[in-house]
């Protein structure tokens, strides 16, 4: 019985370590053609928060509306494919 408990403990630790390494690997990935992510994004207007989100629709206030790609990834807004040609003029 002691051998099976030890084996189960080793398997459990291995599973936890693999989950942690997979999670870290996902956080290191970055989509291509991304101009800025989350806290790296400078505010574009006074009410902008620095990209925290829970779903894609939360990024509407963090990305300029002319950014075609506005996604929530690991609770950070990703704004990309922004064409400066259609950027609003500063007031």
Swiss-Prot record:
GO BP: any one term: defense response to fungus
GO cellular component: extracellular region
Keyword set, alphabetical order: Antimicrobial, Disulfide bond, Fungicide, Plant defense, Secreted, Signal
Recorded superkingdom: Eukaryota
Keyword Disulfide bond assigned: yes
Localisation per UniProt entry: Secreted
Disulfide bridge map: 41-82, 53-72, 59-77, 63-79
Signal peptide (from-to): 1-25
Main localisation: secreted
Family: Belongs to the DEFL family.
Protein name: Defensin-like protein 269
